[in-house]
Amino acid sequence: RGLGDVYKRQGKDGKLMTSKAKWWTSGFFPGVLWYLYEVNQDDSLKMYAENYTKRIENEKYTTDNHDVGFMLYCSFGNGLRLTSNDEYKQVLLQGAESLSTRFRPQVGCIRSWDWNQKVWEYPVIIDNMMNLEMLMWASKNSDNPKFAEIAKSHADVTMKHHFRPDYSSYHVISYDTISGPVSYTHLRAHETLMNL
């Protein structure tokens, strides 16, 4: 495979499918390799984990979607935890900086996507919660409270708006960014089969 290819999932025919590093699940496969290495300390697994982790390093500069948090924290986060490689720390700190550019204080959340703006003004999906661990880590490891403040704000707003009375969640909430503070009257729930 090319250097930028990562495994994304198993296809219907049972064969592994690959994707480019920008694909939203690109950090999961290297993250799993790090977990396998943690369990059995097999150096060949460590080598594969390092290789597949390196393939997504440029995503630390991603600012056009929210996926950067879980792409990097699953891979580089586990790599750092198991090896103390300072290069991994720098990747994570840059990734947190990139992710934080998607936060809008007026909304209190990290914007998920930039596409389909005719439907969603400021879409936030429930998956975005997976990014908060990296932001909390970055705040602690950089002494920059900004990252923790973003994570806490995002969690608070998500808890307030994303969940129904029966505790199921909407997949997408679109927030109004123009008419002032967000309230329930400014929310549009994207009703699809993707709702949890």
Q: Where do the PLM segments sit?
A:
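Aromatic- and glycine-enriched pocket-lining scaffold segments that form the walls
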Residues: 109-170
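Structural helix-adjacent loops and short alpha-helical linkers that scaffold large soluble proteins
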Residues: 36-50, 80-93, 139-152
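Conserved small/polar residues in nucleotide/adenosyl-binding loops
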Residues: 2-10, 185-192
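Well-ordered alpha-helical segments within folded domains of soluble proteins
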Residues: 22-37, 64-81, 122-140, 188
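Long, well-ordered core segments of solenoidal/helical folds
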Residues: 1, 46-63, 91-111, 151-168, ...
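Short linear capping/connector segments at secondary-structure termini
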Residues: 8-14, 53, 112-118, 174
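Internal amphipathic alpha-helical repeat/solenoid segments
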Residues: 5-26, 36, 48, 56-61
